[in-house]
Amino acid sequence: MRIGIITLWQSNDNYGQQLQCWALQQALLKLGHEPYLIRYDIDGRINNTKKPLWKKILKVVLLYPLIKKLIRIKKDKVEKGLISYNATKNKERRFDEFRNVNIIQSDTVFKNLKELQDNPPQADAYIVGSDQVWAHLLSNYENRAMFLDFGDAKVKRIAYAPSFSMQLYPIGLRQELVDNLSRFNSLSVREKSGGNICKKHGFDVSVVVDPTMLLTKEDYNVLQSNEKHTKYLFLYYLNISNPEDIEWNELKRIAHKEGLKVIATPASGYFPGRELFDGVEYQYATINQWINLIESAEIVATTSFHGVVFCILHHTPFIYFPLSGKYSRGNNRVVDLCQDLSLSGQIWHPKASLEEMMNNDINWADVDLKLKNMRNESQNFLYNSLI
């Protein structure tokens, strides 16, 4: 069966985004299907089809008094400078090369929903997912693409592990949500909170694992690099703007005490990644190198869901630092996963001792057994959805 997948794919520094895309294709290939990525330009990066958010904000700010105008311009200048710096460093990560070599892609890049509707990608089934594809609200008509509002009605439509990244869908958009969910033949989500949203609106839904967990550690060997490092703590972070968001001074003290150097890799999520920490070795790793950095670390400190996932797959001890404020909605996926695998003790909280957490004795055999059961259920959902 030929299967078109629509998901997030354009990041040049978010490792989890690329690997969930690759992993779902691999899982479908194992089932004997012919998957490919539908290259939908949701970010408006190609030919500048969409005005960047910072420009829209700036346009509004220009209507305000001069002082607000100057503050906004300065902030935009800083952010644009950061984006420019990241673009230079991201060349070292070689994500374009990874996509071109490892991900089967549509020849066409669809720049908007109308192009998808006028010239729909040919497939026997469409899948949306995974990642936070349903965090893009239906108040923007273009986001109906992530609810598969294109193509022949006879084509099967499946949601595999999409994330809403919210607890409740906005009241004013709930009928829109019902209309768009009604399009699917099979529905699943990645988080329990997403399952509750669907059930509240009358839909049967399965909660399944992220595509990266459909595969085993051995499946990722084809992507491994074999670089060696002296003993180190790996710091993989995104969505933080202050070193103390991850208790940096204490973390640094413990690493020094244990004789561990610190290797750090920043990434972009809700906002651009940035270098925040002193006395660390920054590596803008390729995807293959990133997997190796997690597997070979003595311990990983991370704010990333996929950082946690790959620690679990490779039996690498980890500490997850929850996001705070308006970004705390991103914690649900990690909390759900760690609860399901009896790993909640690896989630930091203000009363926790980092030193004790770093020395927790994780029962990896128990984790593997629980993950195997979750994986089997998710594989069965995928298989049955495509019969």
Q: What spans do the regions from the language model cover?
A:
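Active-site anion-handling motifs in enzyme catalytic cores
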Residues: 1-387
